[in-house]
Amino acid sequence: MENLYAGLEMLARWDVVLALFVGSIGGVIIGAIPGVGPAVAIAILLPATFSLDPIVGLTMLLGIYGSSMYGGAIPAILINTPGTAVNALTSYDGYPMTQNGEGHRALSLAYSASFWGGIFGIGCLILLSPVLALIAPMFGSREIFLAALLGIILVVLAHRGQIFAAGVLAMFGIFLQTVGLDAVTYTQRYTFGYSFLSSGINLIVVVLGLFALSQAFFLLTAPDNVPDAKPVQGKMTAGIKELMKHKRVATVASAFGVVLGMIPGTGEFTAQFMSYTYAQKTSKNPELFGKGSPEGLIASEAANNAVPAAAMIPLLALGIPGEALTAMMLSVFYVHNVIPGPQLFQNHIDLVYGLYFALILLNVIVMIFLLFSTNLLTKIIRVPTRFLGVMILILSFVGVYSLRNSLTDCMISASFGVLGLVLKRLNLPIVPIILGMVLGGIMEVKLRSAMPRL
């Protein structure tokens, strides 16, 4: 009970509540605008959170992460253009429902299923992360090295059809984290005589380049487009009752989201695809899938919204991120000398419970906001892509420069932006580079500390 009160007390602070509202509502808006996405938004905001209290910065980023998929369902359903990549399957059944004049029903079902999946995922986070944190001290350097290596392998295997490319990009990420000071001997390595590489390549500089700047370049080089989304008419609460008729589908899909969200490299799309396939195979009306099936819509939305909370389980309990967004959040912990893992549950239990309550509250805030503001969001969808590109470009460079007031960082980030654009054009994954940088650092330190005992 003492931990419970500590978490509630932390969440009751005005700055935390403000950060949660800004992150939650901002995440919905960002998710609703095709071409932006949570990775871009979090990458841009990340430098600003370093000067904030850990709970404030993490709450804001969690708000964006957890709410963006709610918003991403809106354009997927109304204009057949997913707001985020993980809402791709939502358009399969959501858009046909809109064509049949049931757009309000589809949106209401999507919101309700997302809320169900979000709360289910948070419940599993609260139950499983302390248990995993208790087991974690039994892991030595060798076990943690193997866990990080497994994470790299799973990230690579998750990109079916691109396993070789994903493996090469993951190794490139591992190489990037070796540049600069040796983590054990503190000697220079791979600087090639350039002084600006002596302190290493900053993860945030790479993240902003690969995600934010590459997306800005992509939007600026693409034909200008203004999506057309018409206002929605009808009761937005109808889907809440209908969801209860399909609660088995919602629960199973949420379970898929939790299990796959805990596994590094799998993420929302894999969970969404597997839950959608399961729902179709077990449905009494499988022929409706892809033509406006409420079960298909519920399965996809419940699964992808259960993932954010589930992805926090290995991050909080082991300090191992499972995807790019949790890797970004890991940097917020490190900046404030708060190390995720078993010690987090011993020394900063109030922060842990504060994050639990923040996740619950963000789902409530987003659900209420969407029920009353959907038509407002349909207007926001109509933002021209060129305007988005310019805004992302400006904010990204401001974020990079604010890290160390360095123009060199801006040039490095721009280089990674070009690399990210090339990878997008070639339809190659970006995530393995980021996870290679994060998990590669863990692997190196743990391997070298374990070697004397081999």
Locations of regions flagged by a protein language model:
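A structural-propensity feature for long, helix-poor, extended segments
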Residues: Y65-A76, G83, S293-L318, G322, ...
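Membrane-embedded alpha-helical modules
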Residues: S108-N225, V335-L454
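Re-entrant/interfacial helical elements at transmembrane boundaries that shape
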Residues: P38-A48, L61, A76-P96, L127, ...
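Membrane-interface alpha-helices at helix entry/exit sites of multi-pass transporters
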Residues: I55-T59, P96-A113, S283-G296, I320, ...
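Membrane-embedded alpha-helical segments of transport systems
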Residues: G66-G71, S112-C124, L132, L176, ...
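Transmembrane alpha-helix interface/packing and boundary motifs in multi-pass membrane proteins
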Residues: S24-P38, S68-N80, V155-R160, S254-T266, ...
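Short helix-coil transition sites and intra-membrane helix breaks within transmembrane domains
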Residues: I29-A39, I77-N87, F120-C124, L260-F269, ...
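Helix-loop-helix hairpins and the membrane-proximal interhelical loops
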Residues: M1-I55, P137, Q188-S293, T378, ...
